[in-house]
From Swiss-Prot:
It comes from Bacillus subtilis (strain 168). The phosphoenolpyruvate-dependent sugar phosphotransferase system (sugar PTS), a major carbohydrate active transport system, catalyzes the phosphorylation of incoming sugar substrates concomitantly with their translocation across the cell membrane. The enzyme II GmuABC PTS system is involved in the transport of oligo-glucomannans such as cellobiose or mannobiose. The lineage of its organism: Bacteria, Bacillati, Bacillota, Bacilli, Bacillales. It is found in: Cytoplasm. The gene is gmuA. This is PTS system oligo-beta-mannoside-specific EIIA component. GO terms for biological process: phosphoenolpyruvate-dependent sugar phosphotransferase system; polysaccharide transport. GO terms for cellular component: cytoplasm.
């Protein structure tokens, strides 16, 4: 996935990009668990990998935001940004939990 540059985006567009990528990742994570339940283990792994790509894109955007702010350009706080941050962080937690669950299922042949 190509890295998006946030330099020409508004704060709202940046927030929506975070929501977009973390939302896509969240969907893949849930689909992964469902695929595993249906016995489609390879598909489950592929969906986790796809989720990680979207989370990587979100992380890149987030990192650019931090770099921008550390360079003296303040980020405007908004409810939308807070929602985007919450969405990203909860999706990261969900990914780690589901990966651990899938590993457990595999080791126990569930």
């Amino acid at each position: 996935m190509e890295q998006m540059k946030i330099t020409n985006l508004t704060d709202e567009q940046i927030s929506f990009q975070l929501i977009l990528h973390s939302g896509n990742a969240r969907s893949c994570i849930i689909q992964s668990l469902r695929a595993y339940k249906e016995g489609k283990k390879d598909e489950a792994d592929a969906l986790i990998a796809k989720a990680e790509q979207d989370l990587s894109a979100a992380h890149d955007i987030h990192f650019q935001m931090i770099q921008k702010e550390s360079g003296g350009e303040a980020t405007a706080f908004s409810l939308l940004l807070m929602h985007a941050e919450d969405h990203l962080m909860s999706t990261l937690s969900m990914k780690e939990l589901v990966k651990e669950m899938l590993d457990l299922f595999k080791t126990k042949n569930i």
